[in-house]
């Protein structure tokens, strides 16, 4: 059955409108010499989304800017290119720019994630807060009436109970930044009952109690829930599940990175979903998209990161 999306605020495009209302936003891009990255940057400039500092090979960056994007429109936002001799140097310069408040958002360019994260986690100039860093993806799914937030599809391999609690806090902060004031969180498992042989069900139940006891705040957690029960009220009703979260989950907390990664890519490639994603838990939002992600996805991720500044 097709579900009509009646609220334009539940479109990723609306995040771009929200982001343009925020002042003094500067994005530092590490190793910016990539066509998809620069296409997203140029589109963001066209929409007056943010100022940009592009770190990387000056010649390669300017070649892409000047040859591939000759028709870029004038913007009231600034674009600066800073040369770096290596990926490592570009990552350090970009992270330092955010650490010193020269920039407010960090964006990954054509650089291995491990190289960028090494700078992000640097004890001298990095962006560590003591909290776990986690991947938070916001999906706009065709024929579905709400944003769907998935965590974690790209950072934490096999999180334990406390790490899952921190991942919920990170995802809930992102949810509030995009207008979901009191997000509903479903810890996902294969079944919706506790099975001592399935750690995901035990953790889901524990997280629910932690939420009820005030150890996880600013959201409502109920689990474990199977995916169908989390997103379909009809499926939950058929199984007799009475819950404030079942069928209405805003955040899907997956038990392991394999589950998150497969769900993430299935939504994009099979369901034709649109997505924006950030790394939360650092001193500033980090846009850490895959090098295979489209320019559109990178633009939505930028808008999501900007909306979540200081949240």
Enumerate the predicted regions with their spans.
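Anion-binding alpha/beta catalytic cores of soluble intermediary-metabolism enzymes, centered on
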Residues: 1-245, 250-254, 259-311
């Amino acid at each position: 059955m097709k579900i009509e999306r009646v609220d334009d605020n539940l479109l990723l495009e609306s995040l771009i409108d929200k982001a343009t209302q925020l002042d003094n936003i500067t994005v530092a891009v590490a190793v910016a010499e990539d066509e998809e990255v620069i296409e997203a940057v140029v589109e963001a400039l066209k929409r007056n989304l943010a100022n940009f500092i592009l770190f990387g090979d000056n010649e390669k960056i300017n070649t892409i800017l000047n040859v591939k994007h000759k028709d870029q429109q004038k913007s009231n936002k600034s674009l600066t290119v800073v040369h770096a001799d290596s990926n490592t140097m570009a990552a350090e310069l970009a992270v330092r720019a955010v650490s010193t408040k020269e920039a407010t958002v960090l964006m990954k360019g054509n650089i291995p994630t491990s190289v960028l994260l090494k700078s992000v986690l640097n004890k001298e100039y990095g962006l560590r807060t003591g909290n776990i860093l986690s991947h938070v993806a916001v999906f706009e799914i065709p024929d579905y009436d709400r944003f769907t937030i998935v965590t974690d599809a790209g950072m934490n391999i096999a999180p334990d109970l406390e790490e899952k609690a921190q991942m919920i806090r990170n995802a809930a902060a992102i949810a509030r930044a995009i207008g979901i004031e009191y997000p509903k969180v479903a810890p996902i498992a294969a079944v919706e009952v506790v099975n001592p042989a399935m750690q995901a069900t035990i953790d889901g139940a524990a997280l629910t109690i932690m939420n009820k006891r005030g150890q996880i705040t600013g959201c409502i957690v109920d689990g474990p829930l199977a995916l169908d029960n989390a997103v379909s009220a009809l499926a939950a009703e058929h199984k007799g599940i009475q819950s404030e979260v079942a069928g209405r989950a805003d955040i899907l907390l997956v038990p392991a990175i394999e589950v998150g990664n497969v769900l993430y890519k299935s939504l994009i490639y099979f369901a034709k979903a649109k997505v924006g994603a950030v790394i939360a838990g650092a001193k500033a939002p980090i846009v850490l998209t895959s090098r295979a992600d489209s320019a559109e996805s990178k633009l939505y991720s930028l808008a999501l990161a900007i909306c979540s500044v200081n949240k």
